A protein has these predicted regions:
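C-terminal and inter-domain tail/linker signature
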Residues: 1-121
Length: 121
């Protein structure tokens, strides 16, 4: 798999609740992340993702576009937590030895009355 394929596979699997197996296969043991809601270590984000999967068991994820440049991959995706909760999410992955070693993310909830006719997607 390319790094881009790994990033998308990881996002799809954790979104459907397959968190630990996705981590075991794709995440480097020395992984760090920049999600401000959790400690920056591997286990803290893993547990947070498991809790999110339990809270939103019907969550869906769609990768809309992805870019790969050397050891970096960026994925723009659409997450639907519930019928009235749709989010645009951008993940930036850094890879080392074929594994995800670092992760950044930014998200924005879709609003219905946006003045921008182009929207988030």
């Amino acid at each position: 798999m390319t790094n881009k394929e790994i990033a998308i596979d990881f996002l799809k699997r954790v979104s459907r609740g397959d968190v630990r197996p996705a981590y075991e296969e794709h995440v480097h043991p020395e992984f760090i992340h920049h999600n401000v809601y959790f400690k920056g270590d591997r286990e803290s984000l893993l547990v947070g993702m498991e809790e999110n999967a339990e809270e939103f068991p019907d969550k869906s994820y769609e990768a809309l576009r992805a870019l790969e440049d050397k050891d970096l991959v960026t994925v723009h995706g659409k997450v639907q937590l519930a019928a009235d909760s749709i989010w645009a999410v951008i993940h930036i992955f850094r890879f080392e030895d074929g594994k995800i070693i670092e992760l950044w993310e930014a998200s924005q909830e879709k609003i219905e009355d946006s003045p921008n006719e182009h929207g988030l997607f």
